[in-house]
Amino acid sequence: MIRKLNSRDAGDIEYCLQQKPMFGQFVRIFIKDLGIDIENCNIFGYYEKTKLTCIFSVVLNNLMVYSYADIVPAKEILDFLKNHNINFSIMKGEESILQQFTPYVKVVTKYGTLLCKLF
């Protein structure tokens, strides 16, 4: 999903990461891979049917591209990048820390690296 940033984009970061330590590790690695400060990468969580879900987001041209952390729709993100004339390249591969999320592609842009799930 893609939406514009608003003032309500916030919090619950540590709580989400504490509830899912392994996922928290993945999120931190993802943010580090982006090469941006955590303040510029909004992470927030919410309850959905008693299940805590974490979402990560990447800021691109003042828009937020976000998805469930374990399912990033590659087509949606690629369409977004194309529609906004953002140059990108695609890297395929597996890394041990991310094997549970494979198959996936890495979409590399000047704004950072996006991890996209394949279906």
Name the predicted role of every residue range:
Residues 34-59:
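Conserved beta-hairpin
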Residues 1-13, 94:
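A short beta-loop-alpha structural element at the N-terminal edge
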Residues 15-19:
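Short Lys/Arg-enriched alpha/beta "domain-start" segment
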